[in-house]
């Protein structure tokens, strides 16, 4: 067990179930929510070590969730899960305070390295999202900071 508490926010039950099994082997307590309001409430209540949140949670203004989480809970590390692999989404999430960006289609391979990197104060972007030159430049910028 690496840490005590992780909070997973995703409105897709299959994703929650698959990721939960993985997280239970890495954390003492795994909490799950399915929307932005529940995420913010749970983060306030349980103060997790890590939040893994779907970029497209219901009632979310997408990027705003990363910014809101970072502004409200700057000490909680954040990894964004997303189906979007465009450099603008990645850049906006990372600039908003996320430390990791994992594509849902590669999460089975990328989530553990992302968690390990982020918990050790490094950043992580799914390698499959880095095939575009502008995404590679973004990764280099975030790795240097």
Spans of features found by a protein language model:
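Short hydrophobic/Thr-rich beta-strand motif most characteristic of the beta2 strand and flanking loop
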Residues: 7, 27-37, 42
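Conserved active-site segment of CheY-like receiver
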Residues: 11, 81-85, 104-106
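Residue-level signal for the "D+5" position in two-component response regulator receiver
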Residues: 32, 57-60
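Acidic catalytic/metal-coordinating carboxylates
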Residues: 35, 61-64
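Short amphipathic alpha-helix used as the core "switch/output" element in two-component signaling
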Residues: 63-75
């Amino acid at each position: 067990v690496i840490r005590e508490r992780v909070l997973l926010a995703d409105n897709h039950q299959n994703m929650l179930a698959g990721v939960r099994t993985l997280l239970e082997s890495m954390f003492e307590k795994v909490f799950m929510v399915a929307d932005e309001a529940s995420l913010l409430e749970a983060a306030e209540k349980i103060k997790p070590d890590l939040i893994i949140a779907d970029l497209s949670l219901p009632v979310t203004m997408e990027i705003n969730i990363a910014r809101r989480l970072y502004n409200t809970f700057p000490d909680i590390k954040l990894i964004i899960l997303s189906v979007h692999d465009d450099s603008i989404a990645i850049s906006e999430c990372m600039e908003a305070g996320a430390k990791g960006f994992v594509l849902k289609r590669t999460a089975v391979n990328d989530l553990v390295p992302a968690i390990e990197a982020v918990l050790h104060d490094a950043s992580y972007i799914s390698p499959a999202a880095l095939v575009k030159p502008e995404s590679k430049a973004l990764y280099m910028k975030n790795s240097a900071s």
